[in-house]
Structure formats: C-alpha cells, structure tokens
C-alpha cells in the first residue's frame, strides 16, 4: 500500500499570455488545461506550449496554485 501523500497530483495549466495582457477585450476568459504530474519526477512547476483559444495561437501555459 502507498504511504504518505499521493504521488500523482492534478494540476491546472493557465495561459501566461492572457494573464499578462489582463484578458482580451473581445472574448473574456483565460485558457486553462487540467493535467496530472508526478511529484517525484517533476518537483518544479510545469510549463507546456498549448493552444490558447482566446489568443488564437500556441502560447506557454504554466502551472498555477489551487
């Protein structure tokens, strides 16, 4: 049986471009993705290039706190 905290946790990735701009004026919203990460293999914050439907391009999505 596993002891201690769960190794795999659910994290939320948020578009860093939308956050910096203060959200687009035409379409209100910030692009977010939900994924999992392994705490032992990746203790640092995740960053992926994903498509942002509000910016209409591929941008860096970084992990945020819950």
Curated annotation (Swiss-Prot):
Q: Which domain of life is it from?
A: Eukaryota
Main localisation: plastid
Q: Which GO terms describe its biological process?
A: translation
Name under which the protein is recorded: Large ribosomal subunit protein bL33c
Alphabetically ordered keywords of this record: Chloroplast, Plastid, Ribonucleoprotein, Ribosomal protein
As one GO molecular function, the record gives:
structural constituent of ribosome
GO CC aspect terms: chloroplast; ribonucleoprotein complex; ribosome
Q: Which residues form the signal peptide?
A: none
Q: Which Gene3D superfamilies match?
A: Ribosomal protein L33
Answer whether the UniProt record assigns the keyword ATP-binding to this protein: no
User: Record's family?
Assistant: Belongs to the bacterial ribosomal protein bL33 family.
Query: Which cell locations does it reside in?
Result: Plastid, Chloroplast
Under Pfam families, the record lists: Ribosomal_L33
Q: Where are the transmembrane segments?
A: none
